[in-house]
Curated annotation (Swiss-Prot):
This is Restriction of telomere capping protein 4. Belongs to the RTC4 family. InterPro entries: RTC4, RTC4_C. It is found in: Cytoplasm; Nucleus. The lineage of its organism: Eukaryota, Fungi, Dikarya, Ascomycota, Saccharomycotina. The gene is RTC4. The keyword Phosphoprotein does not apply.
């Protein structure tokens, strides 16, 4: 790095720098001068650049340069020079003026009465389980990605595999197996989907997003999203509001948050531009990414649930999705999504000396067999 000094021309007219050199690496560093002695195998030299060559600075020249840099740094850090009232003031828009600007826009209004789709009391009690909510939030943070073109392809490859702390890894497998046995017995849930199965089945039902966006079908998750928007004083949901939100209400049941995130990205690829242009206040409040992730994705997965259980109406699918969230966060989110993750799971079970019954492959078809048959 190169630092410009404000010293007078007779004191220091050229650019000065401190070079810290060692046998293993060389680099530039700002800061006060250190004594000219060996420091961790490196030697500090006072040099300046003149006509393409390096000359050593005198102590007085270096001190002038160092004092000027220290003065600049102090001025930048002086809190009196920053108007905190202006810099951190809340920008709250007038909702009436917002509605005025949106007059005449294509506003989304659902055709059914949204109030009839409130969550049953049993589901509300389930959502209050702290351990499940904490697990869900950890998984969502672990698999969340930024909104960019490269992130989409990286996420679809599932490059980030789930890694658990060693002291909790075995207990997590034990609890996951117990939850799986409970829900498989009670609900006869289908095997957790692999990535290719998930993408294929999602594309069969992704067009339901059009029906939701035009108000042709009702949506439980849109109704809940609208309630959040109505209770907020802001135009756009904040990170603080997301943290305070009971995110389990927007989790896609037995599919889990990991697979829900992938469906959300598939939806964003297809409907991202349409969501950006939509002037509906609920969509504007949540934004294209979160609206795809927390509203449209669980809605699309609810239609996969209808197929799994051969249901005739979406309301029954919503009930199943709401009551199987624990399976999603404790079983589906820990189950291999891609083929290479199966080997990781098998290695973990061997290391922990857990029998085959704790493997997710004890109830799922192994896709490696299909690959082997295709090769043969």
């Amino acid at each position: 790095m190169v630092s410009s000094s404000n010293a007078s021309s007779d004191q220091l007219s050229q650019e000065s720098l401190v070079i810290i050199s060692s046998s293993s690496h060389e680099g530039f560093s700002y800061g006060k001068r250190h004594p000219t002695v060996a420091l961790n195998g490196s030697l500090n030299k006072k040099l300046r650049v003149r006509s393409g060559s390096l000359e050593e600075l005198s102590d007085s020249e270096f001190d002038v340069s160092a004092k000027e840099e220290e003065k600049k740094s102090t001025e930048l850090q002086d809190p009196k020079s920053i108007d905190l009232e202006t810099q951190f003031s809340d920008v709250e828009s007038d909702l009436d003026s917002l509605n005025e600007r949106n007059k005449g826009a294509d506003m989304l209004e659902l055709t059914d009465d949204e109030s009839v789709h409130e969550l049953p009391g049993s589901s509300r009690d389930f959502f209050d389980e702290n351990d499940v909510e904490e697990m869900s939030m950890e998984l969502i943070k672990m698999y969340s990605i930024g909104l960019n073109a490269e992130g989409v392809s990286e996420f679809k490859k599932s490059s980030a595999s789930l890694v658990l702390p060693k002291n909790t890894e075995k207990s997590t497998y034990l609890k996951s197996n117990a939850v799986r046995q409970k829900f498989m017995t009670k609900y006869d849930l289908p095997p957790v989907l692999f990535l290719d199965q998930l993408e294929s089945r999602t594309r069969e039902h992704i067009s339901v997003c059009d029906a939701i966006l035009t108000g042709k079908v009702s949506s439980l998750y849109y109704s809940m999203a609208k309630t959040v928007q109505k209770n907020s004083k802001r135009q756009v949901i904040t990170n603080e509001e997301l943290r305070d939100l009971n995110i389990l209400k927007f989790t896609a049941g037995y599919f889990g948050s990991r697979r829900q995130a992938i469906v959300g990205m598939l939806i964003l690829e297809t409907y991202g531009e349409k969501l950006k242009r939509n002037k509906n206040p609920v969509i504007s409040f949540w934004g294209p990414y979160d609206f795809s992730q927390y509203i449209l994705a669980p809605e699309v997965l609810s239609y996969l649930c209808m197929d799994d259980f051969k249901l005739n109406n979406i309301e029954d699918a919503w009930d199943i999705m709401q009551t199987t969230i624990e399976f999603g966060t404790m079983v589906a989110d820990l189950s291999p999504l891609e083929v290479y993750e199966i080997e990781c799971e098998e290695e973990s079970l061997r290391r922990l000396r857990l029998p085959q019954q704790y493997s997710s492959m004890s109830y799922r078809d192994d896709p490696r067999r299909k690959q082997d048959s295709n090769v043969g």
